[in-house]
């Protein structure tokens, strides 16, 4: 009996340690960020959670990108890694999500440069003993999108992009190969997000968005020894979309409202 109490107390203390979540992505993440945050907070309650994020429509990891006059610095150069070094506290668990990879391809960045950037990011996050989750690019151009479909999407989302169909296809294959090969005990590759994509094959379908983020939230929280099933409420999805639109307009475009300390 004398050995049971210390073990139980130790386990309880471990599960009550604060957790820091690092979210990196583009439009999919930005559109559902607040709902994902609330979903995770419920799953790990009463464990304290804090969040930092770098996201935005059209955002790249190694290249500047954005939408209209909302232009974002590359995620690798936005200062979030330095902030985590200063923000992390003793015994804090760190969980990182790297998602929405692919915009850099359409900005003409080579697969080699993108892979080098991702490797640097993985190495840097590894310094914090981070549980890292990284989603592959959920599209295979040759099997999922015709060349005509590709040109239509490029004209809508990346009208100035010179990238050709074959070039994008080869880059996606190279990057996804790197992501899958990077998987280890601390890095989990999430390679099954295609099922949630909408007609453009880039963004998650509005009808499947909640399921997509519940799927990801379950992986993130399971790494913290949590067995509560994530629930992403419809009201939270609506709020997330509205909040994202307001942030893009009032903060990123007009600069009326300042960014929070958690935003990079």
Residue ranges and their predicted role:
Residues 14-20:
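A short, charged/proline- and glycine-enriched loop
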Residues 30-33, 104-107, 140-146, 196-201:
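Short catalytic/ligand-binding loop motif for oxyanion handling, primarily in non-cytosolic enzymes
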Residues 144-192, 209, 214, 218:
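Substrate-gating cap/lid alpha-helix
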Residues 20-113:
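Conserved SGNH/GDSL esterase-like catalytic core that processes O-acyl groups on lipids
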Residues 171-184, 197-264:
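Histidine-centered active-site loop/cap adjacent to the catalytic His
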């Amino acid at each position: 009996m004398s050995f049971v109490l210390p073990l139980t107390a130790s386990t309880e203390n471990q599960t009550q340690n604060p957790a820091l979540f690092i979210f990196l992505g583009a439009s999919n993440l930005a559109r559902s960020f607040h709902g994902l945050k609330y979903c995770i907070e419920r799953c790990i309650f009463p464990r304290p959670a804090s969040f930092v994020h770098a996201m935005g429509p059209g955002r790249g990891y190694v290249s500047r990108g954005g939408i209209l006059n909302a232009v974002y610095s590359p995620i690798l150069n936005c200062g979030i890694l330095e902030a985590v070094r200063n923000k992390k506290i003793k015994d804090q668990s760190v969980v990182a999500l790297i998602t929405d990879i692919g915009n850099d391809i359409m900005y003409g960045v080579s697969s080699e440069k993108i892979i080098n950037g991702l490797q640097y990011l993985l190495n840097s996050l590894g310094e914090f003993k981070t549980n890292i989750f990284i989603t592959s690019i959920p599209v295979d151009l040759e099997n999922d999108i015709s060349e005509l479909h590709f040109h239509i999407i490029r004209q809508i989302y990346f009208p100035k992009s010179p990238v050709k169909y074959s070039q994008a296809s080869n880059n996606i294959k190279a990057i996804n190969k790197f992501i899958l090969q990077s998987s280890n005990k601390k890095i989990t590759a999430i390679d099954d997000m295609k099922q949630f994509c909408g007609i453009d094959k880039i963004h998650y379908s509005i009808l499947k968005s909640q399921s997509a983020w519940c799927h990801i939230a379950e992986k993130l929280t399971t790494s913290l020894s949590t067995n509560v099933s994530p629930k992403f409420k419809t009201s939270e999805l609506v709020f997330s979309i509205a909040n994202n639109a307001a942030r893009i307009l009032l903060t990123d475009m007009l600069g009326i409202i300042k960014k929070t300390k958690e935003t990079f």
